[in-house]
């Protein structure tokens, strides 16, 4: 008598409509067909209404003004208006990621501090900020803080000629001159030499079993080579522009010079940094706690200081836990920047809404946003 007990015979006897692998492929095929059907149906309805699908409107005159970002006038095209929105979003997201990471790292470490007061302050900040909607925080920062600051005539002046008023913040700024192009190779050379020295230093110290970081080896070439180039070339490659309050003949007071951060940009950046920093602090705290306690005890037995333990042992091992959720927080910060429309900051979403209303190109504008 033949016995059918083999595993291979059992698999060959399973009907295809019950095979999990076949069902997965069929489900994907059905999904693709449904998506294509929806796209084709939407496109046919779109064309059936006499509408045309084209991005040629981007070359048309925008006929509206944008007060935030790079230079723009109503005679510029929709394409440049969209570029203004993209650059504004990149500005606030890039700076927000840098400052929120620093704030989150410091707060996360402070949350685990042995100092009772520091730990409680960090915990209070995290709990309050995480449980308050970001839009509420933006409204508070913009309407109750920024707009309540003194006007330009009575602006708060901080050391270094930093002006703070209800129109925003004005900072001193370095601006390149015609000699900057001759100085640029020295900057690039300094960066290359610093990276090479750091790699060589790190490999050598790792072979000896010593700490692998030395700020001196990075700082010397980064400072000496650009300074040498500054002395060799003719003219200053960069000039420091200091802001100052001036009164125009029409009686209007304004601040000239430096770089200006508008009140909307300041409120949005501050809100995103404070809000996202609280979440990053919890990510950092979870990553530090994931490192076994024995690592810290062994480092103390070897005579490491608390700073060395954190920098050389705890944080490098905690990165495997920190990085995945940290990237999610970066994406959340970028997406949350669309709330800028609540305080009239001209980010990508706000500019796109204006383009949509002016041109009537709904599908094209949303495709640009998605891209």
Enumerate the predicted regions with their spans.
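Transmembrane alpha-helices and adjacent helix-loop boundaries
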Residues: 2-371
């Amino acid at each position: 008598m033949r016995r059918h007990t083999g595993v291979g015979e059992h698999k060959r006897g399973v009907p295809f409509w019950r095979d999990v692998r076949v069902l997965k492929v069929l489900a994907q095929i059905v999904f693709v067909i449904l998506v294509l059907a929806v796209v084709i149906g939407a496109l046919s309805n779109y064309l059936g209404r006499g509408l045309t699908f084209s991005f040629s409107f981007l070359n048309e005159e925008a006929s509206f003004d944008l007060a935030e970002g790079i230079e723009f006038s109503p005679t510029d095209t929709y394409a440049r208006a969209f570029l203004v929105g993209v650059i504004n979003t990149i500005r606030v997201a890039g700076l927000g990621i840098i400052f929120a990471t620093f704030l989150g790292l410091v707060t996360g470490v402070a949350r685990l501090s042995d100092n009772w007061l520091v730990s409680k302050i960090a915990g209070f900040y995290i709990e309050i900020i995480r449980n308050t909607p970001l839009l509420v925080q933006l409204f508070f920062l913009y309407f109750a803080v920024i707009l309540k600051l003194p006007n330009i005539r009575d602006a708060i002046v901080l050391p270094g000629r930093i002006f703070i008023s209800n129109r925003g913040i004005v900072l001193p700024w370095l601006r390149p001159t015609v000699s900057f192009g001759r100085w640029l190779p020295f900057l690039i050379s300094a960066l290359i030499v610093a990276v090479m020295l750091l790699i060589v230093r790190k490999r050598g110290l790792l072979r000896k079993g010593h700490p692998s970081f030395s700020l001196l080896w990075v700082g010397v070439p980064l400072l000496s080579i650009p300074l040498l180039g500054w002395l060799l070339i003719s003219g200053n490659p960069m000039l420091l522009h200091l802001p100052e309050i001036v009164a125009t003949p029409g009686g209007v007071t304004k601040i000239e010079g430096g770089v200006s951060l508008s009140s909307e940009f300041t409120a949005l950046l501050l809100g995103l940094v404070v809000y996202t920093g609280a979440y990053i602090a919890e990510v950092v705290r979870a990553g530090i706690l994931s490192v076994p306690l024995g690592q810290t005890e062994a480092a103390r037995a070897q005579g490491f200081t608390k700073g060395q333990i954190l920098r050389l042992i705890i944080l490098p091992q905690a990165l495997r836990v920190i990085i995945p959720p940290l990237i999610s927080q970066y994406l959340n910060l970028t997406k949350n920047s669309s709330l800028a429309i609540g305080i009239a900051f001209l980010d990508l979403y706000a500019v796109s809404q204006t383009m949509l209303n002016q041109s009537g190109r709904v599908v094209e504008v949303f495709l640009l946003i998605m891209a």
